Amino acid sequence: QTHRLVAHQFDQGQEMHAELLKVWENRKDEVGYLGNALYSMVTTLKAHIADLKATTAAKERIEGEMSAARAIQMGMLPHNFGEPAPGARFDLHAVLEPAKAVGGDLFDFFPLDEHRLFFLIGDVSDKGVAAALFMAVTKTLFAVEAKRDSASVGGIMERVNHSLCENNPEGMFVTVFAGILDLRTGEISFSDGGHELPFLLRHDGGAAMIEKKKGGLVLGFVAESVYRNDLIQLQPGEGLVIYTDGVTEAMNGDHELFNATRLGDSLAAISPDCSARTVIDRVMNSVRAFVGEHPQSDDITLLALRWHGPSGNGPPAAD
């Protein structure tokens, strides 16, 4: 009888339980004690398996929901860059390489009129679906406010910030760098809300972080925050590289950060004739080579922009 019990499979359920219970009731010797022990073990194991199945199903459901949230988030970002047309006055490319968790990085760009290009990059303070939703709201507000009144980048920031603060029960915030490039003059009017300062790509080669300005607070924190306008004057062939802290805080196996110095060195090694796409690709390659197999903990977002002059010298013939 004991051999028959051992031969049973755990998923035979009630039949096995009944036999174990019968052994336990009819025998008071070692076999009875064994039956009692087996009965307790099987009962515990079945409960554990049931819990495990429920946990696995819940985990798979959550992972599916997070994957869907990430897909929706990525779908909101510009993704069809194409190649700059000959004679184009500017060249722009951007990338967002997501970490496993749903994050809140964002970028956007769009023409305000025939001669002005709006662009921004941002980083929401948190992770998860809430951060993705906050990112979507932020991106939408910037598009609405910039197209409604683009006289001042600082004014756009103030209106977006006020809207974010009005309904923000989770206390989330977002760092933002936003600007308007005048394609006729190469002048960039920009405003900074607690974001990393970009690098200037010089027309004769090299790169340098732009001069430190008195930036504003992160958006979503204080409704009455004031955001100033600052100016950068580009020469033909010059541009900007804007990034989130996922770039400079990328970590290798020795727990060293990629940092702004390494980013500057990587940019300085890139030919001034390279396209915006190539600038992005080479920086990403530098980050990946530095990080190695260490897992990515944050979204990595980069935006590169070059101005080719008022008449447009077009993109480089080759990179």
Pin down the residues of each PLM region.
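Membrane-proximal alpha-helical signal-transduction linkers
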Residues: 1-20, 42
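Divalent-cation-assisted or electrostatically stabilized phosphate/pyrophosphate-binding catalytic cores
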Residues: 256-271
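Signal-transmission coiled-coil "S-helix"-like helices
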Residues: 29, 39-53, 248, 271-274
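… and, occasionally, acidic/histidine-rich disordered N-termini of signaling adaptors
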Residues: 21, 51-241, 282, 289, ...
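Cytochrome P450 core scaffold surrounding the K-helix E-X-X-R motif
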Residues: 200-203, 251-257
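The cytosolic transmitter module of two-component sensor histidine kinases
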Residues: 16-34, 88, 131, 153, ...
